[in-house]
């Protein structure tokens, strides 16, 4: 199987064009294993589609399916344009719905569309939370310091609510910093596009930031987010790393 390794703002992915009906869940676990495989946060399978430019299947590195991955969608768009020669403005289908993307060399902008749902704030484990669905569910806690991030606490919240967990610090009305514990990876990751999107949207909804901001994840790679016409957009660099063939068991 030919595969391509991509990185996007701290998240890394293995991407391939579907050419057989293998057990993709088991394959995802094998490929994404950082000790015995290629190593990645997620596995993306690109499939043809009659109506859209393509369809994808996204797998977390534990083999579970995910409806959406923000940085994964940007990596998939970069791959579709530069490898599969699809037009730079594209529309593709995910488990969370239709995604629009624009590729400009190594920068990719993606629209996550309309926010799926937002719940009221609540108290749990000594902190205030809000749940926001940007294609996948995210718990968000606004904090005074990102040193408050606690992996054990995140594990408890993730298990109870079956959601990703984000801590966000507002630096000013145009800049946020975010740390994310990702469901499916079951650990803190260097970045999470849908998580940063949830943090931005809730901050904007609560009138704490403007409708266009910069967000810095743990990777340190700044990304741009904007909310316009009731859609959430974000943009950042995508890096093609390498391509190779893999003989899976």
Curated annotation (Swiss-Prot):
InterPro entries hit by this protein: DAP_epimerase_AS, DAP_epimerase_DapF
Matching PANTHER family: DIAMINOPIMELATE EPIMERASE (PTHR31689:SF0), DIAMINOPIMELATE EPIMERASE, CHLOROPLASTIC (PTHR31689)
Record EC number: 5.1.1.7
Function: Catalyzes the stereoinversion of LL-2,6-diaminopimelate (L,L-DAP) to meso-diaminopimelate (meso-DAP), a precursor of L-lysine and an essential component of the bacterial peptidoglycan.
Keywords: Amino-acid biosynthesis, Cytoplasm, Isomerase, Lysine biosynthesis
Protein name per the record: Diaminopimelate epimerase
Catalytic activity: (2S,6S)-2,6-diaminopimelate = meso-2,6-diaminopimelate
Active site (UniProt): 69 (proton donor), 192 (proton acceptor)
Organism of origin: Campylobacter jejuni subsp. doylei (strain ATCC BAA-1458 / RM4099 / 269.97)
Signal peptide residue numbers: none
Pathway named in the protein's UniProt entry: Amino-acid biosynthesis; L-lysine biosynthesis via DAP pathway; DL-2,6-diaminopimelate from LL-2,6-diaminopimelate: step 1/1
A GO cellular-component term linked to this record: cytosol
Family note: Belongs to the diaminopimelate epimerase family.
UniProt subunit comment: Homodimer.
NCBIfam families referenced in this protein's UniProt entry, alphabetically: DapF
A biological process term (GO) from this entry: lysine biosynthetic process via diaminopimelate
Matching PROSITE patterns: DAP_EPIMERASE
Residues engaged in binding substrate: 11, 60, 70-71, 164, 182-183, 193-194
Pfam families hit by this protein: DAP_epimerase
One annotated GO molecular function: diaminopimelate epimerase activity
Sites marked Could be important to modulate the pK values of the two catalytic cysteine residues: 138, 182
Subcellular location: Cytoplasm
Enzyme class at the top of the EC tree: isomerase
